[in-house]
Amino acid sequence: MNINLLFKRTLLLFSVISVFTQADAQEAGVTSLQGIADVKKEVNFMQIALVEAYNKPSTKPIQFIGNKKAREIPEMDADLSNVKMDPFGKYTDANRTSSGIASPGPINNFNGLNDNSTSIPPDVNGAVGPNHIMVTLNTQVRIQDRSGATLSTVTLNSFWAPLGGITSTYDPKILYDHFSNRWLFCSSAEPQSNSSSTLLAVSKTSDPTQGWNLYKIDVDATNTKWVDYPSIGFNDRWITVQMNLFSMAGSTATSHQIYVWDKADVYNNGAGVFTKFEITNESTAIVCPSIHYDNSTSKMFLMRVASGNSSGKGTLTMRTLSGTATTPVLSAPTTIQTNNTWASSGANNTNFAPQLGVTSLIATNDHRMRHVVVRDGKVWAVHSVFLPLSGATRSGVQWWQFDTLGNVQQRNIIEDPTGQRFYSFPSIAVNKKNDVLLGYASFAPTQYASGAYSFRKSTDPINTFRDEYVFKYGENTYFKDFGGTRNRWGDYTNTVIDPTNDSTFWTIQEYAGSVINTWATWWAHVNPYTDIPDFSADNNYVCPGESVVFTNKSNFSGSSFQWTFAGGTPASSTDANPTVTYNTSGRFRVTLVVDGKTQLKDGYVVTLANPVRGINKNNVLPCEGNTITLTASQASGVYSWSTGATTRAIQVTQSGTYYCDITAPNGLCSRRSDSVVITFAPAPTVTLADFNAINPNATPLQLTGGTPAGGTYAGPGVSNGVFTPSVAGLGTHTITYTFVSPEGCSASASKTIEVTNAVGVNANTKITAFSVTPNPSKGLINLSITGVSNSNLKVQVIDQLGRIVWTKNYDDYSQNIKKEIDLSSLPKGAYFIKADLGEASETQKLIIE
């Protein structure tokens, strides 16, 4: 059967048209409407996965950065008619510190879902059920078992596709409702489009691989606004989703909407009954609804960061939802103020947080409210702050505890007053013991972007959390802007309570993946109430050959320690606090077993690459007057040459020893290059004697007069040190003598030689007559010489290149010599025939046809 037909028959798809009724008017600037969803569909997750696998969706990058980017929320003062004042005064470096107690390590940690190069930021979210884990990102949706094994993965678009008209979904968030054992999932769809919608999905059971009800609502019938950044909460009667609206033209913040869904309706296969509140009098938005872990209060709370500096005070607002499931009532805001102030973002809301190895910063967004939870009648809230107010140099996580009236009971900031460590994108959970886990992103110039958390026990000193615990260190540098201007991270994370015990915690955080410029996500399961083997390292990022000191941090006194160090020397140890050397680059797991209990940390030690030590020299000879270029083999990094230069390549003109101190792009590993010795040799002194004029028909001249001996001659008519005047032709010619020293340095001298008919062809008084007939000849010639003295006669035939091609000696000592010579074996051409008496010679030109 066609798989698409099977899918359609199984899902029982149907639609419902929105119906709105006007509710009673509330405060000015707030309207409310009641209605039902525009579209509802029933789906099965595994069948969605089956259809997606069949259709093989495109992996072409979505690049949310183009249409859907981080929207800046303008500052606006809150209503000051009903103000709750923070009683704790101003922060100081002393009261901003942690309790000084170590946060517990995780009992388990593993990978969630990684970068598929289709979206920045990923918008990290996840939730935990009794048997499953779900991860929802801008890219994909994944279901895992509780040990981290992947059960199924689909794209975010595919999950929502049954609603129809879905081309671009974003900003997913997911929760597990422990009251009803259901999964709650919201997203936005179609940014900057007339089809802009809010989406809600609820599972039919605690098993997310099975049935779901999906709902879609068009957020603006006038098609002048679009929706961004939903926040979701729930209690025993409502599922509440808040989102921000922006103008279609210019994307200016206009208002925000709060959809209060009747939980009983959507859980019982209803049409999607909701009440919508639209607030236009506080465009600063991000009114974050509360997540309830018990039924200690019938109200739901909606928290907002109004301003980091409202007349010298930081300002929040609290609204409440009360009433019945079908007729919720939204209260006017209560204003909460503190004498502490903060900036709403880093400079111009751009890249802000540092990372190891590169100057590229990472965007930490703004101070919007991120997460609100309720437990035992206490409201906990977290958001980022940027400090100081004027010219922020760092980011931190500000946390609050309120009573249900908005009175501040605790608050503080997790931050580093020295400005070395940055924290952002917080999320919080509170268990039945009123212990708290706060997860967040951790940044520093000494680490890659990492995932971390801090724990608070209910009996810890007021206004304190325990020390930061980095449970997943980043593994590489990160920069990805898809052609935009911001190196996006976040936009959020999630921290939740385990529904099986209401005591242990889970947090999912983003970290820089092992592949350069990729993000990834990682889960940590934290149980503060059990014996947990744990350890720390004095350095998680080392260079080859460096050592790491490991310290046992287990929360119980163990008697037996068994360490295993992948990539380390030694590879194992039974010491409580061993020292291990890492000699090769890579990302290495460390395992500690204490009394049979195991703690394993993947990629815990990152051994970075040392820079390449080589220096390349160009082919220019080291001779005085030349310039030699030296280039470091390391293609990128920081360079510090022995000359003081800081470029990769330098030019050298003087003798000496040269080297470069190189820092690798990771910013951590440095070493000195190989040394290069350059010795510039002096150029030789070359001279050349003058030449006499020569007849064009004269025999080729062996050139001499160049010093030092052993050089070469060059010029017109010169070959192998012989000058042939007939080849050079009439005129004045330059002869150059070049000498190369043993060091390879050369110098030259030049003189001119004149070829002219004014000079005879070797006139000689001892030879009174010299004839060659016939000339031209077919090869057989008659040679006649008169006036020969009593000496040996040597006759030579020389070609145009000065080579002797025929020779013969005669010992007839008569005054007249006549000889017949056969030269027919020679190739046709022009030659010289020379009669040589030793102390005198005569030459004539000879043509052989």
Predicted segments with their positions:
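Proline- and Ser/Thr-rich low-complexity, intrinsically disordered segments
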Residues: 531-557, 569-574, 583-772, 814
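C-terminal outer-membrane/trafficking sorting elements
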Residues: 4, 9, 14, 21-25, ...
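Residue-level signal for well-ordered, solvent-exposed loop/turn and beta-edge residues enriched
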Residues: 149, 181-182, 407, 569, ...
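Surface-exposed loop/edge segments in extracytoplasmic proteins
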Residues: 150-154, 210-213, 569-573, 648, ...
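Exposed aromatic-hydrophobic patches
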Residues: 579, 649-651, 818-824
